Every structure is written in structure tokens, then in C-alpha cells.
């Protein structure tokens, strides 16, 4: 599947968000942030990370450039998670806002997910989930 062209680009290039995951023997958040630095050109509307701290899922998001996320992560200096995911977003659906940043949380805060692209039949899927009582938290989850 080809990534979509983004209208804000000056050149005729394809645009995708930046996605990274890490599972290893080192603390994950610094590895993920370094990866997001390398991918920031793929999206600077928002950024976010998800990781397990102890037995709790932590998702930290920020609108704007990666530096805004790094400021928020400074409040978590003792993060020792050995796995996690990260995302830089170029808004193609939904406004640039923290609520629309990835990772998205589901499953009673037991699942964090990141994706790239637009699900073409999202409206049909959303209506079905709303009918079942699901509460959406953003324009992009």
C-alpha cells in the first residue's frame, strides 16, 4: 500500500508518520525517543509514547514537535520499561491536537496501538462501535 501524498509538502513526495517500537534489555523510552528524533521529519504535529511501568500502561502524548513530548517525559525520570512504542504524527485526518496523537488506548487501558494511514470505511466501523456503546476519545481512534 502506498502512503498518501500530503498537501503541505513542497515537493511531490510521499508522507507517512514515524513509527517505532523497541523490546530489549535497555530502558525503552530513551531508545524510542532517539528513534523518534530520526523520524521527526515524518511528522511534527504531535508525538507520543506508550510503555509498561510496573504493571501499568503509561501513554504520554504532546501536541507539536518532539521537544514538547520530551518535556512531558522529564516528569518520568525513573522509567525502566524495557519495551514500548512511539509515534510522530503528520495530521492527515483530525486536527493536530494532543487528543488525536498516538498511541491510542483501548481495552480498559490495557492496550496501546499506533497505526499509519486512514481506514477507508472508518465511518461505518465507528457507527457500529457507537451502537455497541464504545466511547471514542479522539477524531483518530
Predicted segments with their positions:
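Conserved short alpha-helical segments that host acidic/polar catalytic motifs at enzyme active sites
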Residues: 2-4, 10-141
Amino acid at each position: 500500500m502506498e502512503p498518501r501524498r500530503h498537501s503541505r509538502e513542497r515537493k511531490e513526495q510521499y508522507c507517512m508518520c514515524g513509527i517505532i517500537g523497541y523490546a530489549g534489555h535497555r530502558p525503552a523510552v530513551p531508545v524510542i525517543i532517539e528513534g523518534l528524533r530520526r523520524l521527526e521529519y515524518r511528522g511534527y504535529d504531535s508525538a507520543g509514547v506508550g510503555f509498561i511501568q510496573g504493571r501499568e500502561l503509561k501513554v504520554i502524548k504532546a501536541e507539536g514537535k518532539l521537544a514538547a513530548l520530551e518535556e512531558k517525559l522529564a516528569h518520568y525520570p525513573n522509567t525502566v520499561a524495557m519495551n514500548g512504542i512511539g509515534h510522530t504524527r503528520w495530521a492527515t485526518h483530525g486536527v493536530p491536537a494532543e487528543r488525536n496523537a498516538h498511541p491510542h488506548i483501548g481495552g480498559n487501558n490495557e492496550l496501546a496501538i499506533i497505526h499509519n494511514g486512514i481506514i477507508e470505511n472508518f465511518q461505518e466501523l465507528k457507527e457500529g462501535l457507537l451502537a455497541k456503546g464504545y466511547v471514542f476519545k479522539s477524531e483518530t481512534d
